[in-house]
Amino acid sequence: MYDGKSFYFEINDIPIYMKGANQVPLDYYPSRMMEKSEIDWIFTSAIEANYNMLRIWGGGMYMTEYYYEMADKLGMLIWHDMMFSCKFYPFKQEAFIETSLIEVREQAGRL
């Protein structure tokens, strides 16, 4: 039972200590950040730092399939924000809610 005195992750009822970083876009030009060599560098750096989790910042971007495949292959956990950050959103507008639901369904299924 959660007592509010600690904060940790559990996977299959096992407490896991997370060590990682917040990943923001590494380049002004997204296409350069999506190159396999850049993605390999991200994961090599994370592993060398003994990280076991990377967080994709909600003000950034969704990564390529290769990124998620590498995370899976290397056992790197990904804490993935949806791309809603640093802005007021029109939550009372039906069109915004509808398009947001589409995005969440598509990305959650992909991730």
Over which residues does each language-model region extend?
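Active-site-adjacent substrate/metal-binding segments within catalytic domains
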Residues: 1-87, 94-111
